[in-house]
UniProtKB/Swiss-Prot annotation:
Description of how the protein assembles with itself and partners: Part of the 50S ribosomal subunit.
GO terms under cellular component: ribonucleoprotein complex; ribosome
Lineage: Archaea, Methanobacteriati, Thermoplasmatota, Thermoplasmata, Thermoplasmatales
Source organism per UniProt: Thermoplasma acidophilum (strain ATCC 25905 / DSM 1728 / JCM 9062 / NBRC 15155 / AMRC-C165)
Matches recorded under InterPro entries: Ribosomal_uL4, Ribosomal_uL4_dom_sf, Ribosomal_uL4_euk/arc_CS, Ribosomal_uL4_euk/arch, Ribosomall_uL4-arc
Cross-referenced Pfam families: Ribosomal_L4
Highest taxon, organism lineage: Archaea
UniProt-recorded Gene Ontology molecular function terms: rRNA binding; structural constituent of ribosome
An individual GO BP term: translation
Protein name as it appears in the record: Large ribosomal subunit protein uL4
Gene name as annotated: rpl4
Protein keywords: Ribonucleoprotein, Ribosomal protein, RNA-binding, rRNA-binding
Length: 255
């Protein structure tokens, strides 16, 4: 099924139409999207573990039988037990190991299906609205712009483009949604949480620096698209802007 969507210029005016690649007709499998997101997120965990010397920094002496006390290692001249898991301040019986393999496997076909399903959901108005994104009524998704937007080098010009396209309201939603997270994470370098807004997919993603400082905006190239950017939190339907060159690159995707 060839679906046509409008192409917008740098000024936000419609300049033509383009056929969407077959990847946008992929069967949507939200369960596989969640599974792939979980596998990728868990695989990014940082290994952690306790010190090999934890609980073993005291010298303990084992007593002989016949003294009426248990034969556990104790400090010299005292009765305090040290160096075993059941002792106060002793070592952990089965502490975390930094050598543990935290990688979570997922089938290649499932990983590809998750990515293609997430791309297909970017063209669903219902899925994008359900995710909470805000945009102009009657806007046809996905949004495709000409390659000239890669030459935008000022943030004020980027804001003007997003306003002309009718998606700047989603940037405001992300800015207003920034809040201090609950729990200990606020003390560990991740104090704030902020909703994701627009994803911009461009063939030359490194050239689109003008969009980087906008709240919740992510930039990616067609080759670096990941389920973490297409479906944050494992929920597909992210509001996405593709450049004309990025759409052409997606036509080469092997279904």
């Amino acid at each position: 099924m060839n679906t046509k969507v409008p192409i917008y210029s740098v000024s936000g005016e419609m300049k033509g139409e383009i056929d969407l690649p077959e990847v946008f007709d992929t069967e949507v499998r939200e369960d596989i999207i969640r599974r792939a997101f979980r596998a990728i997120s868990l695989s990014m965990r940082q290994p952690y573990g306790s010190s090999p010397l934890a609980g073993m920094r005291r010298v303990g002496h084992t007593t002989r039988p016949g003294l009426g006390i248990s034969r556990m290692p104790r400090i010299a001249g005292g009765s305090r037990v040290v160096g075993i898991a059941s002792a106060v301040g002793g070592k952990s019986a089965h502490s975390p190991r930094t050598t543990k393999n935290l990688y979570v496997k997922i089938n290649d076909r499932e990983r590809k299906m998750a990515k293609y399903s997430a791309i297909a959901l970017t063209a669903s108005v219902e899925a994008v609205k359900k995710r909470g994104h805000r945009f102009k009524e009657g806007l046809k998704l996905p949004i495709v712009v000409e390659d000239g937007v890669e030459g935008i080098n000022k943030t004020k010009d980027a804001i003007a483009l997003l306003k002309n396209l009718g998606v700047y309201e989603d940037i405001e939603r992300s800015r207003e949604g920034k809040h201090i997270r609950a729990g200990r994470g606020k003390m560990r370098g991740r104090r704030y949480k902020q909703p994701k807004s627009v994803l911009i997919v461009a063939r030359n993603s490194s050239a689109m620096k003008a969009f980087r400082s906008l709240p919740g905006v992510d930039i990616a190239s067609p080759n670096s698209l990941s389920i973490r950017k297409l479906a944050p939190g494992g929920v597909g339907g992210r509001l996405t802007i593709f450049t004309e060159g990025a759409i052409e690159s997606l036509k080469e995707v092997d279904q």
